[in-house]
């Protein structure tokens, strides 16, 4: 008798889980599509790219000035008095240090100004995207929405559940 009750309880549990699973509605978005087609995200990326290009140009100028000074030093090395050699060497060391400091300050992985600026510029963009995703999820009665282009691996996705363009539309309409 206990054996039959156990089997019946397993069957009911299985039926209950199957019923619960059929009520789940899952969708996905491709955040890369949103970031490349939504005007606010495009502008933000353009601003970040402009800043990166500006700092890269400054770094290139500093490096070229250093290389020119090092070449001049090498050419004049044999004719320079000892005190001038020492001063030129100190200048070169200082220039090299300035280049390294600038590179670290602007571009250091995770701590450089470019990463801080990225977070600052894209924080409101991400908030708007998440808000639009939430609205679409509620409108569509979805329980879960995954990002197809994120770290979550999505091995198969039926395009019927793709809500990327609904989210993009919501962002473009500003609602």
What is the role of each PLM region?
Residues 4-14:
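Sec-dependent N-terminal signal peptides
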Residues 21-175:
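Amphipathic, charged alpha-helical segments and their helix-to-coil junctions
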């Amino acid at each position: 008798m206990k054996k039959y009750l156990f089997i019946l309880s397993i069957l009911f549990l299985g039926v209950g889980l199957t019923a619960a699973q059929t009520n789940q509605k899952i969708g996905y978005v491709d955040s890369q599509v949103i970031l490349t087609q939504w005007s606010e995200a495009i502008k933000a990326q353009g601003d970040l790219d402009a800043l990166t290009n500006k700092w890269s140009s400054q770094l290139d100028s500093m490096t070229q000035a250093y290389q020119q000074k090092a070449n001049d030093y090498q050419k004049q090395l044999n004719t320079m008095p000892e005190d001038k050699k020492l001063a030129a060497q100190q200048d070169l060391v200082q220039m090299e240090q300035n280049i390294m400091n600038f590179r670290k300050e602007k571009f250091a992985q995770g701590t450089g100004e470019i990463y801080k600026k990225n977070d600052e510029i894209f924080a409101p963009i991400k908030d708007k995207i998440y808000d639009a995703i939430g609205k679409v999820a509620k409108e569509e009665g979805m329980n879960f929405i995954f990002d197809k282009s994120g770290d979550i691996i999505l091995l198969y996705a039926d395009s019927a559940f793709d809500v990327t363009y609904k989210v993009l539309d919501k962002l473009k309409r500003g609602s």
